[in-house]
């Protein structure tokens, strides 16, 4: 009788342990899905903000380019135009950053994806913003 009791208790403990392991795996996979969804939402918001900023900058840069396109230019103004053209190309390359990031990082885990996306944004946006600042500073200096 004691042997049957020990076997029954052992079976109950083993099944309870198996259920808890299964629940842990399910909660981990649900957490991974939620983290992935939140990363996609953050990327979507960032893409929308970046798109708005990009559109505004493109409009401002086109306006500046059109003012310099008419008439004779000095060597300094020619250099400013070259910088503006480079900035325009960089902004055009940012059209689909989310798709590019997903395509490049399919094999990485979620933390590596977030880090890579942030590094890529900094790598692209840093020079673009500094170039725009330099160009606008030079223009204001020339106009003033």
Curated annotation (Swiss-Prot):
Residues 1-18 form the signal peptide. The record marks 59 as: Important for flexibility. The keyword Secreted applies. It is found in: Secreted. GO terms for cellular component: extracellular region. The lineage of its organism: Eukaryota, Metazoa, Chordata, Craniata, Vertebrata. Belongs to the bombinin family. Keywords: Amidation, Amphibian defense peptide, Antibiotic, Antimicrobial, Cleavage on pair of basic residues, Cytolysis, Fungicide, Secreted, Signal, Toxin. InterPro entries: Bombinin. Pfam families: Bombinin. Residues 19-43, 74-123 form a propeptide. The modification Leucine amide is found at residue 143. It comes from the Eukaryota. This is Maximins 1/H1. GO terms for molecular function: toxin activity. The keyword Signal applies. The modification Asparagine amide is found at residue 70. Expressed by the skin glands. GO terms for biological process: defense response to bacterium; defense response to fungus; killing of cells of another organism.
């Amino acid at each position: 009788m004691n042997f049957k009791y020990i076997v029954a208790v052992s079976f109950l403990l083993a099944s309870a342990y198996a259920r808890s392991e299964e629940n842990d795996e399910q909660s981990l996979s649900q957490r991974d899905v939620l983290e992935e969804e939140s990363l996609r939402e953050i990327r979507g918001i960032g893409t929308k903000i970046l798109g708005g900023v990009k559109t505004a900058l493109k409009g401002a840069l086109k306006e500046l380019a059109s003012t310099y396109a008419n008439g004779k230019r000095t060597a300094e103004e020619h250099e400013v135009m070259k910088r503006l053209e480079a900035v325009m190309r960089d902004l055009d390359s940012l059209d689909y950053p989310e798709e590019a990031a997903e395509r490049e990082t399919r094999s990485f885990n979620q933390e590596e994806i977030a880090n890579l996306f942030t590094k890529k944004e900094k790598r692209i946006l840093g020079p673009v913003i500094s170039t725009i600042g330099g160009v606008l500073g030079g223009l204001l200096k020339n106009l003033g």
